[in-house]
Amino acid sequence: MKSLWRRSFFGAQGRIWPVLLAIAVILLFGCQSREAPLSPGAANFKHEIKSCLTNLSVTLIEPVVNKDLPEIKAALEKVESPAAKLCRLCPFEMGVTDQSGATLAVYPAKGDGKGKDYSNYELVKKAIKSRKIQQQRFFLQDGSQLYLICAPLLRGETLIGLVAIAVSSEDAAKRWGLTEKEFMAIDFNS
């Protein structure tokens, strides 16, 4: 009787490994813990960034389609007040690129004011490929960090460009209590 039971479940050789493997797979995928909910500060940060990106996207679609640089700069300046409210006294920067990652405009303008080519940046490549909001931390030469959020500008299903916001990690920590781990865990697409 015992050998009949063993053969019916484990085969003629009595091998138990397929059953153990199946149980391990079920336990591995079925018992994973869920991500912890966002802290109130991280939730506020997400809400404010998404709101700013939505306002920027609506304002920038036509100027980016027409590659109207003065109008793009004017649109960024118009959105400045909500963006400044976004992070009072934070050094922030907003940028707009075309669909390949070449910079069309940056606000506030810094340095020579000339457009840079960000097409080789991993964050830009991911945002272009996925057509979803992507984020990344970026280290500056002085060792400080920026939190970068890059969102696609879509007209229908067509990618026309990207809009990006950079916020100092130090100021984000002061304003929202946002840690690097929390920033990287935020899903800006939900």
List each language-model region with its residue ranges.
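Extracellular/periplasmic ligand-binding regions of membrane signal-transduction receptors
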Residues: 43-75, 99-104, 109, 181-190
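Helix-start (N-cap) segments at beta->loop->alpha junctions
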Residues: 154, 165-180
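Glycine-rich acetyl-CoA-binding "A-motif" of GNAT/NAT acetyltransferases
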Residues: 159
